[in-house]
Each structure stands twice: as C-alpha cells, then as structure tokens.
Amino acid sequence: MQKDYQKLIAYLCDFLEKEAQKRGFKKVVYGLSGGLDSAVVGVLCQKVFKKNAHALLMPSSVSMPESKTDALDLCETFSIPYTEYSIAPYDAIFNSHFKDASLTRKGNFCARLRMAFLYDYSLKSDSLVIGTSNKSERMLGYGTLFGDLACAINPIGELFKTEVYELACHLNIPKKILNKPPSADLFVGQSDEKDLGYPYSVIDPLLKDIEALFQNKPIDAETLAQLGYDEILVKNIISRIQKNAFKLELPTIAKRFNPK
C-alpha cells in the first residue's frame, strides 16, 4: 500500500506540473484553510513548484482560531510561502446589509469572496488557481458554485475523502489536521458530518458503488439496498447526487441556432 501511495503522489505531482505548463504557468496559488484537503493540495504543490506555490489564508469573522493556527503550522513545516487576507471586514458588510440571511447564504458569500481573492491574486502574480475539492464533495454537490468549486485544475477531484485522508498520512500531514473533524468552517459549529448526516467512512463506500454500478445510468436504490446499505442512507445520498448533479455540468450552453 505504501508503494501504491508513492505512485499516486508521483502521478498527482506530474499532473500538476504538466497541466500548469500546458496553460503557460510557472506559478500556482490555492486557498489554505487549515483543513485536510487544502493541506494535501498545498504539500503536493510545494513538491512541484517549490517557492512558486503560494497559499492564501482567508479567515472570516466566524473562522475557528485553530484553523488559522493549523494552516500556519503547515506553512512552517513545509516551507510554504503564504499571504493572509482576512475576509472578516467583507462578511461584516454582508451581514449588516442582510441581517436575515441564512447560514447557507452567509457561507456561500464567504466561499465566493475567497475565490475572488484567489483569482485577483492569480492575475496579479500570473499564477494558476488550484482546486481543493475532493470527489465525495463533487459527487454530492457539497460545495459552492463559483466558490470553493471554482479552479483551473484540481489534483484531488477524483479522490474520495477517505482516500485523501490516506494520502495525507503518506504526505506526513500534521496529526492535528488529520484528526480534526472535516469542516468548511463557514459558520460556528459547522461540520461536514452534521451537514451530510453521515461520516465519510459511511458515505464513501456507497459513492464508490454508485460510480461503479450506475455510470451514465439512473441510480437504482433497490440494487444498493440489496448490497446491504441502509435504505435511508441510500435515499438521502441519491437525493443529494440528483439535486446537485448540475453543478458538475455548468455552464449549460445552448447549441448554435441553425435556422432552416
């Protein structure tokens, strides 16, 4: 297994290098939250681009203090260049204008604000924006359109969350990051498990079977239940996949009009 993950690391590093070169970039930038996914992407980018891989730390007014601490520790451990931009003043303006905004609206605003900072830095420094969303999030649509889902290339987009965790172990990501509950850190008390209703250790095996059995076909709940999955779990996950499938297909562009 150790050998397989070393091959995976080499493969993902090669992907980053070739795709950046293909687009004419020598530098990359990504958002570093202090969470697992961005830590893995950060270390991979550091392996390939060295000082030309730059992390942006963008805490909001509700970000947990340990998120910033963990991000800074990672930068120190792996000699990652970084810049901190607090988005707290901007989310404060949003909150003052939209006092009745839901937590989802507030979270989406912060996610899109972070992406605006990333793309502004990208233009300023001639850097390519690297994504940090994993396959579990992408299949479930668990992300913000034009926010954390936006990027030029993504090295971990085909890795399920549990696979990203295993990869992180082989990249020597600090245990504090490995052991904390997954969270987008978009509002106080938020966690992936609370939002999704299940831990990734339960969700990922189901997602893998859905991908293997129903690629380009309607998902059949009965077949999955026969494999031993809980019926409520199956129903909830299928509902999320179907509801958010459009996020993987955007933008939908009208075909060229051809008058007869």
Curated annotation (Swiss-Prot):
Principal EC category: ligase
HAMAP family listed in its UniProt record: NadE_ammonia_dep
One term under GO cellular component: cytoplasm
Cross-referenced InterPro entries: NAD/GMP_synthase, NAD_synthase, NH(3)-dep_NAD(+)_synth, Rossmann-like_a/b/a_fold
Gene Ontology MF terms in the entry: ATP binding; glutaminase activity; metal ion binding; NAD+ synthase (glutamine-hydrolyzing) activity; NAD+ synthase activity
Protein family per UniProt: Belongs to the NAD synthetase family.
Chain sites annotated for binding Mg(2+): 37, 137
Keyword Hydrolase applies: no
Pathway info: Cofactor biosynthesis; NAD(+) biosynthesis; NAD(+) from deamido-NAD(+) (ammonia route): step 1/1
Function: Catalyzes the ATP-dependent amidation of deamido-NAD to form NAD. Uses ammonia as a nitrogen source.
Annotated binding of deamido-NAD(+), by residue: 112
Intrachain disulfide bonds: none
CDD domains cross-referenced by the UniProt entry: NAD_synthase
Name of the molecule in the record: NH(3)-dependent NAD(+) synthetase
Complex and partners: Homodimer.
Record: residues binding ATP: 31-38, 132, 161, 183
EC number(s) on file: 6.3.1.5
Catalyzed reactions per annotation: deamido-NAD(+) + NH4(+) + ATP = AMP + diphosphate + NAD(+) + H(+)
GO terms of biological process kind: NAD biosynthetic process
Keywords: ATP-binding, Ligase, Magnesium, Metal-binding, NAD, Nucleotide-binding
